[in-house]
């Protein structure tokens, strides 16, 4: 069974935000004094497993756990181990997660044991002081130890860096060399107008077309058709032998090939990262021990999936395109 939206796109990728909490407070993702969801509003790990399983029955082939920081959710490995049965059965092709890396020293080996093959680590700078500045609470050495642990466990690591003008743009070439030297791909992401937007956010916006032009003065970049199921467009870097990805929601949106939906830890389904329209799956999930009601709610929601997002960086307004913080939906 496949889920097909009104524009003929097959929905095969589910991103699940298992918590809105995080041990960092990255400036583009969260307010420093974030008010978190009360625990009673959260789906239990068992409910998350049940919901994910319904999506898998309906054709989801790739499942990514996100946050917040997914590895700070209490007993998260119980959910990972439960979901891994779908890898064993062949129903799910891939189970992966996006993490800030702070908890990887603790969990990397168990993730690998559960059948996770690759992970994404969000890392915007290799400068310890700048790292603390952008994450507010984070420590770079802990993340580096986590990356070491992940690679030692056999996990393939890809780095995600948000490109921020006058913050990390000058060091992105060195980050790429470092990542490729360790066998990791790097993907750079345009900052998106979500949550609280101040002057810094619009001033830090860097179109990746400019970054690519700058990189092409130093490196030989060749477009390649490589895909991981996400929106990144990849180039091969001749000088390093590695892959560099660009995620460009602002300057070259990727909506025409969108294959994903996003589920939050409260059971809210967002059909698009850049739209406010959502569907409540918690109520139908809890209304019956069977899955018919929630399956019908999913079908109805997929039927409302929009053609594209509404992101725009507008210096004339401080109003974000989307009012919720990235940490709520899972970046």
Curated annotation (Swiss-Prot):
Quote the EC number: 4.1.99.22
Positions with a binding annotation for [4Fe-4S] cluster 1: 22, 26, 29
Reactions performed catalytically:
GTP + AH2 + S-adenosyl-L-methionine = (8S)-3',8-cyclo-7,8-dihydroguanosine 5'-triphosphate + 5'-deoxyadenosine + L-methionine + A + H(+)
The GO biological-process annotations, alphabetized, read as: Mo-molybdopterin cofactor biosynthetic process
Q: Which CDD domains match?
A: Radical_SAM, Twitch_MoaA
- PROSITE patterns in alphabetical order: MOAA_NIFB_PQQE, RADICAL_SAM
| Pathway assigned to this chain's UniProt record | Cofactor biosynthesis; molybdopterin biosynthesis
Q: Which cofactor does it need?
A: [4Fe-4S] cluster
Q: Name one Pfam family in it.
A: Fer4_12
Q: Does 4Fe-4S count among this protein's keywords?
A: yes
Stored InterPro entries: Aldolase_TIM (IPR013785), Elp3/MiaA/NifB-like_rSAM (IPR006638), MoaA (IPR013483), MoaA_NifB_PqqE_Fe-S-bd_CS (IPR000385), MoaA_twitch (IPR010505), MoCo_biosynth_MoaA/MoaC (IPR050105), rSAM (IPR007197)
Annotated [4Fe-4S] cluster 2 binding sites = 255, 258, 272
Q: Where is the Radical SAM core domain?
A: 6-231
Q: Which UniProt keywords apply?
A: 4Fe-4S, GTP-binding, Iron, Iron-sulfur, Lyase, Metal-binding, Molybdenum cofactor biosynthesis, Nucleotide-binding, S-adenosyl-L-methionine
Sites where the protein binds S-adenosyl-L-methionine: 28, 68, 122, 192
Q: Which residues bind GTP?
A: 15, 64, 98, 158, 260-262
Which free-text remark accompanies the cofactor?
Binds 2 [4Fe-4S] clusters. Binds 1 [4Fe-4S] cluster coordinated with 3 cysteines and an exchangeable S-adenosyl-L-methionine and 1 [4Fe-4S] cluster coordinated with 3 cysteines and the GTP-derived substrate.
Q: Which GO terms describe its molecular function?
A: 4 iron, 4 sulfur cluster binding; cyclic pyranopterin monophosphate synthase activity; GTP 3',8'-cyclase activity; GTP binding; metal ion binding; S-adenosyl-L-methionine binding
Q: Which family does it belong to?
A: Belongs to the radical SAM superfamily. MoaA family.
Q: What quaternary arrangement does the UniProt entry report?
A: Monomer and homodimer.
Read off the HAMAP family from this record.
MoaA_B
Q: What does this protein do?
A: Catalyzes the cyclization of GTP to (8S)-3',8-cyclo-7,8-dihydroguanosine 5'-triphosphate.
Supply the NCBIfam families for this chain.
moaA
| Protein name stated in the entry | GTP 3',8-cyclase
This chain's source organism reads: Mesorhizobium japonicum (strain LMG 29417 / CECT 9101 / MAFF 303099) (Mesorhizobium loti (strain MAFF 303099))
